[in-house]
Regions:
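Extended catalytic cores of very large enzyme megasubunits
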Residues: 1-123
């Protein structure tokens, strides 16, 4: 949730000083008590640690803070948390049988129903 006491360029980036940004990021992207600054640090540190390249954390943060790198919704919401995966799309491989085509079609429809993008590999 957006906190009106946050300070521009300390708690959120200068480019985020718009009603659209405040409404969007305050609408579920942040953890309880977390500012945009904290969220960007969480993502940057987690990604750098996952890559075994801790020296990249500050570079990732700077790119996000300057608006040079825009994070997909699940990346911002879920990276460094236990509340979901940082993924926007799903991949499905389909075998050459009527049964598999039907089963994978159902899987694709269920993923799409929940907002997931789906890529299909047909063998």
């Amino acid at each position: 949730m957006w906190n009106n006491e946050w300070i521009k360029e300390k708690d959120y980036p200068a480019w985020g000083d718009t009603e659209v940004y405040k409404k969007t990021i305050g609408g579920g992207y942040l953890l309880t008590g977390e500012s945009p600054y904290d969220a960007y640090k969480r993502v940057s540190n987690t990604v750098a640690r996952r890559l075994s390249r801790p020296e990249l954390a500050e570079t990732f943060f700077d790119y996000i803070w300057k608006g040079w790198l825009c994070l997909a919704s699940p990346v911002l919401s879920n990276t460094g948390t236990d509340r979901g995966l940082p993924i926007s799309c799903f991949g499905i491989d389909v075998a050459d049988s009527i049964q598999d085509i039907g089963g994978k079609n159902l899987e694709m429809m269920l993923l799409a129903k929940h907002g997931g993008g789906v890529g299909i590999g047909i063998n």
